[in-house]
Amino acid sequence: FRNYLSACLNKDFVHFDLSLQPEILKECLVPENYPDGCWPSPHTASLMQQFAVNTVSKELSGEKQEGIFSVNGPPGTGKTTLLRDIIAAILVKRAKKMVNFTEPAKAFRKIGEVQVSEKYTPSIYEPDSSICDGGIVVASSNNGAVENISKELPLKKEARGYSDQVGYFRQVSEECVGEESWGLIAA
């Protein structure tokens, strides 16, 4: 938030106009700047969508892992498509860190217990901090749009043709969503 206000109030802050400075666009779109993953889709991102995905991915990969990004546009212009690719990039980045654990259970640490009844006291675990980075918040003045994204993206139909090959906490996701899903990505 501080960065946003600083940019708005600081007259010395440099704003880029990509139509006047296409070299910025070209630099961002070299293959080395693409994230390691994208959403399984028969369609590729448009030029400006890919620029946005690469920019957000780079910012979220930085040391501070912070930034405010605005995506505006009328319905049907690819905002959800853009968000899908950003989510895919985050998931792949986490997966690359998760393979470093010798077994899945080592990615979690017991932090407590909750006594639900006399005979049932489940444990509470927290994930290792190395797999918790890159979180995003999706906000909109249209709460229905955000709710739709949160409910739709985990569904199997959203991973067209790949839903049997991909899984991200699938069992937990199906318990939360109440129907077949490929992964848990929104809360």
Please place each PLM-identified region on the residue numbering.
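Helicase P-loop NTPase motor core of nucleic-acid translocases
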Residues: 1-187
